[in-house]
UniProtKB/Swiss-Prot annotation:
Transmembrane segments: none annotated. One of its GO terms (cellular component) is cytosol. It holds the Pfam family Hfq. This is RNA-binding protein Hfq. Keywords: RNA-binding, Stress response. RNA chaperone that binds small regulatory RNA (sRNAs) and mRNAs to facilitate mRNA translational regulation in response to envelope stress, environmental stress and changes in metabolite concentrations. Also binds with high specificity to tRNAs. The keyword RNA-binding applies. GO terms for molecular function: RNA binding. Residues 11-71 form the Sm domain. SUPFAM superfamilies: Sm-like ribonucleoproteins. Homohexamer.
Amino acid sequence: MAGERAQNLQDTFLNHVRKNKIPLTIFLVNGVKLQGVVTWFDNFCVLLRRDGHSQLVYKHAISTIMPGHPVQLFEPDETAEKA
C-alpha cells in the first residue's frame, strides 16, 4: 500500500454518487430535505445540483444522505458468502 492514499468511506461514497450522477436525498440536522446530484465535494462541503440550480451544503449541517437507488461501493467478499 506504499504510495497509495487510503480513502475514507465518506469520500468513496460521495465520489461514487458524483461519478454515476446518482440522485440523492439529503436531510439536514434542522430537518430540511434537499434533493439533487452531487457535482463537487471537499472536506467541508458538498455542491448539490437540481433543476439547473446549485446549493453549497456544509457537511456539518448534514444528518443523513439517501441515494435514489442502492449503491455497491465494494466487491462482495467471497469468504463472507461461504459462511
